[in-house]
Amino acid sequence: MSRKPFIAGNWKMNKNPEEAKAFVEAVASKLPSSDLVEAGIAAPAVDLTAVLAAAKGSNLKVAAQNCYFENSGAFTGETSPQVLKEIGTDYVVIGHSERRDYFHETDEDINKKAKAIFANGMLPIICCGESLETYEAGKAAEFVGAQVSAALAGLTAEQVASTVIAYEPIWAIGTGKSASQDDAQKMCKVVRDVVAADFGQEVADKVRVQYGGSVKPENVASYMACPDVDGALVGGASLEAESFLALLDFVK
């Protein structure tokens, strides 16, 4: 079945609201048709209202970079999924390796967040990926498979079918090293096979699997040519409007 490609830029902790607004204004009217490709930006929490206002009426989807699994309460410094939905957020990125690494997020946390995101009417972009050590030990498939299974545990088949899963080998994030086309295809297929084993092939055929890790305008088309790669989660190359638009050129 055909899955609509999804290119999402992850700005990480970059841009103030003014810069974010200028970026969205520069790209909003130049995006390809939403029939061809979905384009999104994951903005820092402090930029979300500016991004949402600037993106209004355009094809640009807006994602938060994280949220908590409770809607409100004594959770100082956390972001409410309920409020993210209320302001108009479409997606929430969860389980990014930087969150797992620096903030000690567990598979269980990520699973709770996925459930909270669905409960509030948004969609999760669930990140998974292995370290260089795990990759070199030949255990990438086993490790990533366990991450995916744990993140999706207890979700309905319908929820899983609309989930986006981003495979990002940690050794390729921001390092300038990117996985080969073969590696990306192999691991994105591992992700899909795990979904098939847990929820059935029909669901697995609907899940969109992104590749992330040093994706640039020059190499995005080669990844998008892989049968199991349905998009990309892009860091550095999504920070400039021109570069972000160039990432979407593969649809031409």
From Swiss-Prot:
Q: Where does substrate bind?
A: 10-12, 174, 214, 235-236
Instruction: Quote the cellular component terms of the Gene Ontology held in the record.
Output: cytosol
The places in or outside the cell where this protein is found are:
Cytoplasm
InterPro entries documented for this protein: Aldolase_TIM, TIM_sf, TrioseP_Isoase_bac/euk, Triosephosphate_isomerase, Triosephosphate_isomerase_AS
Question: One biological process GO term for this chain?
Answer: glycerol catabolic process
Keywords attached to this Swiss-Prot or TrEMBL record, sorted alphabetically, are: Cytoplasm, Gluconeogenesis, Glycolysis, Isomerase
Quaternary organization: Homodimer.
Designated name of the protein: Triosephosphate isomerase
This protein's species is: Streptococcus gordonii (strain Challis / ATCC 35105 / BCRC 15272 / CH1 / DL1 / V288)
Lineage here is: Bacteria, Bacillati, Bacillota, Bacilli, Lactobacillales
